[in-house]
């Protein structure tokens, strides 16, 4: 992987521009302009790390840096593993988490996303309340679950995700006063098969075809609410399918590719 040679990649419907800046550790890029020119969900900048194989900076289309992106981690993990000719790589994030990436076959990459956080101040919320039943209601959406997967999420459960006007409700919910750092908004439907169908309004980006941490949040919320007994299922997003497992840490597996 050559330094500063941008690559366009995707992870289950999420599109990224990935810049390797390890040779000079340069973060001075116009992220909004890059996003507008390339039509990507996020810009990923790889720099050096003393604690892992690399440090991954994640910038949304609005130019703001965020803490976590599981789908981007799978793409970066693949690049690092290809560079090292190994099947394992580690990635440091701005929130100090170290993600472990594993090659499980072809371009299918598994990521250990770490332990989810559930306490109200860990998510974080601006006021003490029960994260399993947030006092939030907007039109047909109510009673969401909040969880932190390295970034804040709230999950609403509905009978039919296609009926939810996410384009109009997403911006309002993202900026809800209960979330001082804003929040990723997830609309989940637990299917009879035990799989989860999911739509996502991503903080700082908007409606997105996929979001790995959102898929993790959806499984966790489904288990905590008692909608699922198993801690492993497939989450179906507009951009494709992710396998999510929650034995203790949360794991996500899916395909990556180049654009």
UniProtKB/Swiss-Prot annotation:
Alphabetized SUPFAM superfamilies for the sequence: Diaminopimelate epimerase-like (SSF54506)
Subcellular location as annotated: Cytoplasm
Superkingdom as given in the UniProt entry: Bacteria
Keywords assigned: Amino-acid biosynthesis, Cytoplasm, Isomerase, Lysine biosynthesis
InterPro entries: DAP_epimerase_AS, DAP_epimerase_DapF
This enzyme's EC code(s): 5.1.1.7
GO cellular component, as recorded: cytosol
Gene3D superfamilies the UniProt entry points to: Diaminopimelate Epimerase, Chain A, domain 1 (3.10.310.10)
Marked site positions, Could be important to modulate the pK values of the two catalytic cysteine residues: 153, 202
Pathway(s) the chain acts in: Amino-acid biosynthesis; L-lysine biosynthesis via DAP pathway; DL-2,6-diaminopimelate from LL-2,6-diaminopimelate: step 1/1
Segment forming the signal sequence: none
Binding site for substrate: 14, 42, 60, 70-71, 151, 184, 202-203, 212-213
EC primary class: isomerase
Gene Ontology MF, one: diaminopimelate epimerase activity
Family matches, as PROSITE patterns: DAP_EPIMERASE (PS01326)
Residues annotated as the enzyme's active site: 69 (proton donor), 211 (proton acceptor)
Family to which this protein belongs: Belongs to the diaminopimelate epimerase family.
NCBIfam families: DapF
Role according to the record: Catalyzes the stereoinversion of LL-2,6-diaminopimelate (L,L-DAP) to meso-diaminopimelate (meso-DAP), a precursor of L-lysine and an essential component of the bacterial peptidoglycan.
The protein's assembly and partners: Homodimer.
Name this protein carries in UniProt: Diaminopimelate epimerase
Provenance organism: Wolbachia sp. subsp. Brugia malayi (strain TRS)
Lineage, top ranks: Bacteria, Pseudomonadati, Pseudomonadota, Alphaproteobacteria, Rickettsiales
